[in-house]
Each structure stands twice: as structure tokens, then as C-alpha cells.
Curated annotation (Swiss-Prot):
InterPro entries: PIR2-like (IPR046934), PIR2-like_helical (IPR046527), Znf_RING (IPR001841), Znf_RING/FYVE/PHD (IPR013083). The RING-type zinc finger domain mediates binding to an E2 ubiquitin-conjugating enzyme. Residues 289-301 have a biased composition (Polar residues). GO terms for biological process: protein ubiquitination. The keyword Methyltransferase does not apply. Residues 1-51, 221-301, 411-441 are annotated as: Disordered. PROSITE patterns: ZF_RING_2. Residues 423-435 have a biased composition (Basic and acidic residues). This is Putative E3 ubiquitin-protein ligase RF298. Belongs to the RING-type zinc finger family. Residues 221-231 have a biased composition (Low complexity). It comes from Arabidopsis thaliana (Mouse-ear cress). One of its GO terms (molecular function) is transferase activity. A zinc finger (RING-type) spans 760-800.
Length: 814
């Protein structure tokens, strides 16, 4: 009680004191009820997750009757006790069925509205801004008509105060909670699962749920009162008595409190007028009024209007149970505020903060499980357990399931569920019997216990008798409760049977429609098969045409590509032709210049021949150096071989000899590479000079062929004289140079015998006899070819192509 008072005080303090102090003393609560839901958990670390609702205004109100306070206190008790009904498995099952039906209705209505040309978002916003659909026609027609009228009126749909739902599922969840709350406001004696059952059998029509015959549901309408008085630990609401036997049904509350058709997203407002009982005026507006005419027996229902202000902004992720508890607490707070003695001024809620911190569904379920387990522990601790008697342990084993059955009774138990009856074992050899419900008279459990006639009580002799005296009354209570549940289930079966009989004509019509639809489907299937066949033929023809068109396009693209390539080749050929013409013109000019300068070439020819001779001498010297280098290399290799053979004999000196050998090899290789590199560079240089000189000489010989032979003969003698006269500016010629010069002179003497075009390009004396492949050039004689191959020259002297094979050719002279 103190905790509840602190929650209400904190609630009023958070709202800034605009609603009043909200500190009226809460009515006494049932002390045995320890698992009540705690909505205000003062946890400062989670204060940022508060749920804030939009601002709204409450008009001036002044209570003049203490009856209002009594009604509000009774309603507070009923609402707090009904919070457990959402956790009932049967209620959860009904909730799933109602949610599925309501979602189907909303989607059907949205499809009809969307057929009129509206988008899905606009339709969803318009539906969330419409009324609660309590008209006389079906729910889908109400939604469609109200939403279309709202859309055609041109009101703004996207306002922050009108649209409070993020998706259709959230709209369905909140709508279901509103319908259940509205039914329970009109019928305060109904529990949550009973209100759900009424909505289910009435196709979610709130008016029909109000008008359902009370005789059909009288067994379940006062289950909360009988449950709280007889079995405080049970979590379900078994039917106990009728509405007339329930002294706690708040009848005056239904006459004094106003209920209006609520818009989606709104909680119903409480009474905003003075209490009709206090002022003496006849209540002109009731939550729901049912009048029975004597002659016609008709019933009329009317609902008052409600304010269009939004009281709550639905928050994503909040369960239906939490939304119902929020609504109940808001009603309690407003009733307390209205019941104050002084006047109530107009105020605005800065933020309707319900919980100090947001609790997830897992936290709520775990808290409830802890409360339920504490209740079970309390019940079990009241029963003394025997520790020494074997018969007592057998009784305890048979009695403990009875407690579990009591703590976990489902909303609609199965027919084969065992009843919580404690059975005894006569001996250890007899099998253990399961508790069952039977129509036979119950055995007398007190037969073995002595009875004191003077005191009128049974006197237990041991702990077993004490346990029997305690468990037999509980067994009777459970049997009575089981019988109530059986009657309740039979009543529900009767209601379902009546509902099924009402739906028989509709089922027949639906079967007929199904047969017609099946015939139409077969005809449509045959037509579709023919259409598919024609379509496949057309697609095949279209594919063939498309493939042919693609091939044509590919051919066109290929021809265009070839045309562009040919254009580029033609342009390149034109450029090459112009370049060739330019080169021919330049060659012609050079020939003319050479013809003019032919007289001066005679003097230069002698100088070139002398230079050629000196270059040949240098080549011979380099060849000798190369031979010496090879000899030295052979010597080094022989030395290395000797050292290698010596290493096998002298293992102790292997490391030193290896180092020395490595050094010698490095020096020899370095020297060899240096000599080879130098010789190759010199040979290449001399060969290039020789080729250049030969080219110039051949050009001169072509110009003056007749004078060339005479000049060559004279030139041999002149060379000897020139060599003698040239001793002034040259050093002494070595013996090998003189010998090579004599050989060259002899070759020059025999030069006239070989045709110029058949001379070797290196020695210019022998006839060309070696063919290089793959270039097929024949430029060297056999001797020069051997020298060329020994020097590791792999390029053709004529075209510089790679020589893959050398062929020795012989030609017969004719």
C-alpha cells in the first residue's frame, strides 16, 4: 500500500504539479496478493527511457459526492487484480486469434480503399486518424466509409497529432487493447479473457459484445471475485457464481462514468461532468444503455462521443499488456484527481509519464515468475513435511503434484487432465494411482482418524493424520474448482455450437461459390494453356527474329571494324609511300653529289685502305690476346682441377684451398670477362669500320670498275712505298703485323680472281660459302665462320638477326 502511494506521488511530481497533489490515500490492498504488477520502478539510471504522451487538457471538475471516491477505489482494485489476466495462456491464445482476425479486417479495408486510388501510406495514416468503428454495420464497412469520408474531406493526414502508429501491426495491437478496454468499461464484471471471448464470438463488433446474453457468460463474469476469495494463488479465473451473486460488481461505476467511441491511438476519457448521483440529476449520457421493449423485445445501444485529442503516442515495441496497464493507471490517476474536495482547474499534462524506466517483456515475465515462485514456496511451507515415516513420504509424493496443478491451472483444461486429489498408498507393493475425477462418492479419508464427539473435531495421532486433515479440505476445493471449469468448458462448447449453426447457410453458400470458382478455374486454366501455347510460339518466332537481327548487327559491326582497319592501313601506306618518295629523292641527290665528288674519292681511297690495313692488324692482335686469354683460362682450369684433386687427399686443408680456389676462379673469370669484353668490343668496332670501308669501296668500284683493277695493282706497290714513307709518324711495326700485311697483300693479289659480289665480308678474299638460318644470308667464308662462331657471335653480320643454324654450301664454278 505504501509502495503504491509512493508510485502515485512520484507520478504527480513528474507531471509538475499541474494535476494536483495526487496524494489521496490508496484503498487497502489485498495483503495476500504479492505478485501485483509494479508500474513505477524508481530507477534513476533508466530515467531516459520514459514514455511521454502528447499534451491534452482536462476541463474544470469538482466532485460533490463521496460515492465517486468509493467507485474509483473499487475500480482501482479491479484493474490491479485484472492485470494478471493478460498472462493467462488461454487469454494469450484468444489474443492471437483476435489479432489475426483484426489484421485481416484492416487489410481487407485497406485494399478496398486503395482500389479508390490512394497509396498505402496515406490509407494507413487515414485509418489511424479515424474513429473506433462502433457503427451498426460490419467493421470493414465502417473502416472504409469513415476513412473515405476523412480522405475526401481534405484534412491533413500527416500531422504529428493524428498519425501515431509506425505500421499496421502496431495499429492492430493498439486497436485490440482499446476494444477489450471498452468492453470491460461497459461490463466491469468481465475479466480480460472473457472480454476477448465476447469479441471473438461477436466478430470484433463491440456493440454485439455489449449485447451478448449474460446467461451465456454468467459463469465466467464474476470469476475474479470468487477467485480472490477462494484461491488467492490461482492465476486463472474459473467460473464460480452468477452476476447477481457478486456483491463487488461496480454497478454505479457503469452509470456514472462516460465511455465514448475512441479514435485509434486514444485512451477513453473519464467522466468530465458532475456525478449524477451527487447532483440529483438523471444521467443523460451513459456508457451503454440497453432498453427492452415490452411488445417488440428489441434492444437499442448508443455510445457518446469522445474528444478528438490524442492521449497516447504508441511506441514501437510495447506489448498489449503494457498498453492496457498504462491505460488503467491513467484512469486511476484521473479518478483520484476528480475525487478531490476542492475545485479542479484546467491544466495541461506536460508529459503523461507512466513508468520511471521502460521495462522489456523479458523483465516483466521474469518478475512475474519470481512472484509466482514465491507464492508456491509460501503454500508449500504451510504443509509440514515428514522426515522419518515412509508412509508420509509416499503421501507427500502423491500430494505435491496437486500443488503444481493448482499453481499452473490453464484457462481451458483438457478432459484427460488429472484432478488434484491426494491419494494414499495402502502398502509398498501396491502401484501408485494417478489422481482422477470420478462421479462415484469420495472415500472417507477420516475413517482411520479418531473423532472426538464432545469437541466435534478429529484428533490426529501422528503427522500423517495431521497432513490428511490439512489436505482433504484443499482437495475438495480443487474438485469444486475442476467442476466449475468443466461447466465453463461445456458452456463455451454450447456457444460455439450455436455460432456454428448460425454459420451453416453461409458455409453452404461458400461451398457453392467454391464449386463455381473451381469450374471457372478449370476454364481459365484451359484458356491459359492455349494462351501459353500461342505465346510460346510467338516467343519462339520473336527469338528467331531477334537472333537473326543480332547476327546481322554483329556482321555490320565486324564489317565496320574491318573498314576502319583498312582505312588506317591505307593511311599508313600513303604515309609510307610519301616517305619512300622522299627517301628516293634524297638518294638521288646523294648520288648526284657522289658523282660530282668522284674525282676526290681517289685520294681518299688510299687513306681508307691504309686505315683498313691497320684495323685488320689490330683485329689480329686482339685475336691473339683472346687466344692467350683462352690459354690462360685453360691453365687456370687445369690448376683448379689439380687443386680439386688435391683437396680429396688433404682434407685438413680443404677450407683454405677452397677459399684460394674461389679467389683464383674469381680473378680468372674477371680477367677472362674483361679480356672477352674488350676483345668483343674491339672486334665489333673494327668489323663496323671494315663494313663501312667496304661499302664505300664497293661504291667506288661500281663507279670506276675499269680503273679499280689497275689502281688496286698499283696500290699494292704504293702501299709498300707508303708504309716505308710512313715510318716518320708511326711506331715500329711488330713482326706479326708485317706477316699479316704480307698475307693481306697476297690476298689482294688473288682478289681479282673472285667476283666482288661473292667476297666474304670479313676477309674480303675468300668466297662466301656459309648460309645463316633463318635469315638465309650468305656473307662469310668457312674460316671466317669458324672465327665468328668461336667469338660467340650469334648475330648475322648483314641483318643482325639471331643465327639458329649455320650451313656450309659449295657452288660449282662455271
Amino acid at each position: 500500500m505504501v509502495e503504491k502511494q509512493e508510485e502515485m506521488n512520484e507520478f504527480g511530481a513528474v507531471n509538475g504539479g499541474k494535476v494536483g497533489t495526487s496524494s489521496s490515500v490508496s484503498p487497502p490492498q489485498d495483503k495476500g496478493r504479492k505478485n501485483k504488477r509494479k508500474l513505477a520502478d524508481p530507477s534513476p539510471q533508466n530515467a531516459a527511457s520514459l514514455t511521454e504522451f502528447p499534451r491534452y487538457e482536462l476541463h474544470s471538475f469538482k466532485s460533490q459526492s463521496p460515492l465517486c471516491e468509493n467507485d474509483s477505489n473499487g475500480q482501482l482494485k479491479a484493474e490491479e487484480s485484472d492485470s494478471v489476466g493478460w498472462d493467462d495462456p488461454f487469454a494469450c491464445h484468444l489474443e492471437g486469434l483476435l489479432s489475426s482476425n483484426l489484421l485481416t479486417l484492416f487489410r481487407s479495408a485497406m485494399n478496398q480503399i486503395m482500389d479508390c486510388g490512394y497509396s498505402e501510406d496515406v490509407v494507413l495514416k487515414a485509418i489511424s486518424s479515424s474513429r473506433f468503428y462502433c457503427g451498426g454495420t460490419d467493421l470493414v464497412s465502417n473502416i472504409v466509409n469513415d476513412t473515405l469520408s476523412f480522405l475526401k474531406s481534405g484534412k491533413k493526414v500527416a500531422g504529428s497529432r493524428d498519425y501515431v502508429f509506425e505500421d499496421l501491426q502496431q495499429l492492430v495491437a493498439y486497436s485490440l487493447v482499446e476494444k477489450i478496454s471498452l468492453v470491460r468499461e461497459v461490463r466491469p464484471s468481465l475479466s480480460t479473457d472473457e472480454a476477448m471471448w465476447r469479441l471473438l464470438i461477436c466478430d470484433l463488433n463491440v456493440l454485439k459484445a455489449f449485447e451478448v446474453d449474460a446467461d451465456g457468460l454468467e459463469g465466467s463474469s464474476v470469476s475474479n471475485a470468487s477467485k480472490s476469495s477462494e484461491s488467492p494463488v490461482a492465476e486463472c479465473n474459473p467460473p464460480k457464481s452468477s452476476d447477481a451473486d457478486n456483491p463487488k460488481a461496480p454497478v454505479s461505476n457503469t452509470q456514472s462514468k462516460q465511455s465514448e467511441p475512441v479514435k485509434f491511438g486514444n485512451f477513453a476519457n473519464v467522466n468530465n461532468s458532475k456525478n449524477p448521483h451527487a447532483s440529483g440529476a438523471t444521467p443523460g449520457k451513459e456508457v451503454f444503455s440497453v432498453s427492452t421493449a415490452s411488445g417488440e423485445g428489441t434492444k437499442s445501444a448508443s455510445l457518446t462521443s469522445v474528444s478528438d485529442e490524442k492521449l497516447v503516442s504508441c511506441r514501437k515495441g510495447r506489448t498489449k499488456k503494457e498498453m492496457a496497464m498504462l491505460r488503467q493507471k491513467s484512469c486511476v490517476e484521473k479518478i483520484r484527481t476528480y475525487s478531490k474536495g476542492g475545485g479542479y482547474k484546467t491544466a495541461k499534462f506536460g508529459g503523461f509519464l507512466v513508468e520511471k524506466r521502460g521495462k522489456s517483456a523479458s523483465d516483466l515475465l521474469s518478475a512475474q515468475a519470481r512472484n509466482s515462485s514465491s507464492k508456491i514456496t509460501t503454500e508449500v511451507m504451510k504443509i509440514p513435511l515428514a522426515e522419518s515415516s515412509s508412509t508420509l513420504s509416499n503421501s507427500t509424493k502423491s500430494d505435491s503434484p496437486a500443488l503444481d496443478v493448482k499453481e499452473h491451472v490453464t484457462a481451458l483444461p483438457a478432459n484427460n487432465a488429472p484432478a488434484p486429489v491426494a491419494s494414499e498408498k495402502k502398502s509398498g507393493s501396491e502401484p501408485e494411482e494417478k489422481p482422477s475425477v470420478s462421479t462415484k462418492p469420495a472415500p472417507d479419508y477420516y475413517a482411520a482418524i479418531p473423532y472426538d464427539a464432545t469437541l466435534g473435531i478429529y484428533i490426529p495421532r501422528n503427522k500423517r493424520d495431521e497432513l490428511i486433515l490439512k489436505l482433504v479440505p484443499r482437495m475438495k476445493d480443487l474438485q469444486k474448482e475442476l467442476q466449475d471449469w468443466t461447466d465453463w468448458a461445456n458452456q463455451k462448447v454450447k456457444q460455439a455450437t450455436v455460432r456454428l449453426l448460425k454459420d451453416q447457410p453461409e458455409l453452404k453458400a461458400l461451398r457453392k461459390e467454391k464449386e463455381e470458382a473451381e469450374e471457372f478455374r478449370k476454364e481459365k486454366q484451359l484458356l491459359e494453356e492455349n494462351t501459353i501455347k500461342r505465346r510460346s510460339e510467338m516467343e519462339l518466332a520473336l527469338n528467331n527474329a531477334t537472333n537473326q537481327l543480332e547476327r546481322t548487327n554483329n556482321t555490320i559491326r565486324r564489317l565496320e571494324l574491318e573498314q576502319s582497319l583498312l582505312k588506317r592501313e591505307r593511311e599508313a601506306a600513303n604515309i609510307r609511300a610519301s616517305e619512300s618518295a622522299e627517301s628516293c629523292r634524297e638518294a638521288k641527290e646523294r648520288v648526284q653529289r657522289l658523282l660530282k665528288n668522284s674525282q676526290s674519292w681517289e685520294g681518299q681511297k688510299n687513306l681508307l685502305q691504309e686505315e683498313l690495313k691497320s684495323q685488320r692488324d689490330k683485329v689480329a692482335g686482339l685475336q691473339q690476346e683472346v687466344a692467350k686469354a683462352k690459354t690462360r683460362q685453360n691453365q687456370i682450369e687445369a690448376t683448379w682441377k689439380q687443386e680439386k684433386s688435391a683437396t680429396g687427399k688433404l682434407t685438413a686443408q680443404a677450407a683454405a684451398l677452397k677459399k684460394e680456389r674461389g679467389k683464383l676462379e674469381e680473378l680468372g673469370k674477371a680477367e677472362e670477362e674483361r679480356i672477352k669484353t674488350k676483345a668483343e668490343n674491339d672486334v665489333k668496332y673494327y668489323i663496323e669500320n671494315i663494313k663501312r670501308l667496304d661499302t664505300e669501296i664497293s661504291k667506288l668500284k661500281l663507279k670506276s670498275d675499269s680503273l679499280k683493277i689497275a689502281a688496286l695493282k698499283k696500290g699494292i706497290d704504293g702501299n709498300n712505298d707508303g708504309n716505308k714513307s710512313g715510318m716518320n709518324h708511326t711506331t715500329n711495326t711488330k713482326a706479326n703485323s708485317m706477316a699479316s700485311a704480307k698475307v693481306w697483300e697476297n690476298n689482294q693479289g688473288a682478289e681479282s680472281k673472285i667476283k666482288r659480289e661473292r667476297e666474304c665480308v670479313m676477309c674480303l678474299s675468300e668466297e662466301m660459302s656459309v648460309i645463316f638460318l633463318p635469315c638465309a644470308h650468305q656473307v662469310l667464308c668457312s674460316k671466317c665462320n669458324q672465327l665468328h662462331e668461336k667469338e660467340a657471335m650469334e648475330d648475322c653480320p648483314s641483318c643482325r638477326a639471331k643465327i639458329q643454324r649455320r650451313i656450309q654450301a659449295r657452288f660449282a664454278r662455271g
